[in-house]
């Protein structure tokens, strides 16, 4: 319930709950990744490079009555800002009671929008933290990423487990330098799950627009609650969908 806001040169670029920003998700369990990590005890680390031309403003917003003490350490170095330099962004989107369907051929199946970014930029990773109300696997639908003026997705995957480098639904938490599942409450996939992926070697550049959707297909019909954080670089004019 604590949010991180960072403004670079007067532009709000980071607006995200702490647990998702640092790749841990709901409950903030231990998580280790090339760019973000959590020790599960309240210490978080981010290693994203966040350039700015003149000034940065970092704030924590507490959305709870529970008091806490925060110590923030930042590392700053010289940077040669040019006309091509992009700002780091972390944007957040959540929704509850999203329907999932096990009729894979139904024309009514939902494509849930993870994020849509307008303007020029580079997509670098994301976190999906969720509660699954279904008794078992909920992420059978394809992930779809459209770039600029695509009429068909440039990236068309085969399910949430493959997008997040699991190859099947995670039955225990695991971590790799590029992704993982910090939280997997039950082997059945019921309950809380969290996934993280950072695109260390496979960032996605775009010139005008990027749209990332997840097809909502499952083994059994039901509903899920999704919290989605996206990490990307963009110009001062670039913007992403936010719903929270």
Predicted regions and their residues:
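Beta-strand-centric surfaces of beta-sandwich/beta-rich domains
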Residues: 1-244
């Amino acid at each position: 319930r604590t949010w991180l806001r960072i403004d670079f040169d007067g532009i709000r670029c980071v607006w995200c709950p702490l647990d998702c920003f640092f790749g841990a998700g709901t409950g903030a369990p231990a998580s280790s990744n090339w760019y973000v990590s959590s020790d599960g005890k309240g210490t978080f680390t981010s290693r994203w490079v966040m350039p700015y031309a003149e000034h940065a403003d970092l704030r924590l917003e507490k959305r709870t009555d529970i008091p806490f003490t925060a110590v923030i350490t930042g590392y700053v170095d010289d940077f040669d800002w040019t006309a091509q330099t992009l700002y780091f962004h972390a944007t957040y989107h959540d929704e509850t009671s999203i329907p999932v369907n096990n009729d894979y051929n139904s024309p009514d199946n939902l494509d849930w929008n993870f994020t849509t970014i307008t303007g020029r930029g580079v997509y670098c990773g994301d976190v999906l933290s969720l509660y699954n109300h279904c008794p078992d696997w909920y992420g059978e639908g394809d992930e779809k990423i459209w770039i600029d003026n695509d009429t068909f997705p440039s990236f068309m995957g085969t399910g949430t487990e493959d997008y997040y480098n699991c190859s099947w639904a995670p039955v225990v938490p695991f971590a790799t330098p590029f992704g993982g599942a910090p939280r997997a409450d039950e082997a059945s996939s019921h309950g809380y799950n969290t996934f993280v992926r950072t695109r260390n070697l496979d960032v996605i550049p775009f010139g005008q627009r990027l749209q990332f959707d997840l097809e909502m297909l499952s083994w059994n019909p039901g509903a899920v609650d999704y919290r989605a954080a996206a990490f990307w670089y963009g110009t001062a004019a670039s913007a992403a969908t936010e719903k929270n």
